[in-house]
Amino acid sequence: MVPAAKATRVSHAHRAGGPGLTLRENGPALLVPAAWGVAAGAVLGVVSSHALFVAHVVMSVLLVAFVAASWRDMAAGVLRAWKLVILAGTPVTLAGVVGFLARDGAVPAFAAAVPADALLAVAFYSWMLLPAPAFVYTGLRDPAVPRSLVHHVAAACSVAGTAVAALAGTQTGTVAGIALVGAGQTAGILAATALY
């Protein structure tokens, strides 16, 4: 009988220290399900569009702060793949902020010049899909077979949930797509957090 192999870290060029490290390591595992829960709540009318706007602003700040604080830690391997997701996701999230400002008329110049619904759709669908390649890469680099499968399932849920939400045509269908994405990405980020 072969003893179970200890999970190896597949990244970590520089180990950071300090009180913020635990939050940086575990924060995504809390924020991912929260973000998709808020999105589903907005579709169902439980969360106001203003609250969703505030969530976009807060998330934009958190993304920039997270990547700035973790820049050196995310220089290679799996963490570099996730840094690229954050770097691509920050302007996408900001597009959502601008979309809300244009749609609500808070900035009159945006309301006339910016396609609000298109920007909101870019933010919504991009965050459904952006993590998928990083989940695949993480799964390929993760030596623990059960956990690596979770990464691949997370990628599949991201793509399938996006398709469900895009093709649904109903509130219930859109929420089902969000739930599929949220469940997959939450499982994947929990597995990735364990890998880190």
Where are these regions (language model features)?
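C-terminal ends of transmembrane helices
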Residues: A65-L79, V136-D142, T186-Y196
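Membrane-helix interface and helix-disruption motif detector
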Residues: A42-V57, V98-S126, A166-G177
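Membrane-interfacial loop-to-transmembrane alpha-helix junctions, especially the N-terminal start
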Residues: E25-L30, F53, A75-L87, V145-A154
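Terminal transmembrane helical module of multi-pass membrane proteins
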Residues: D142-Y196
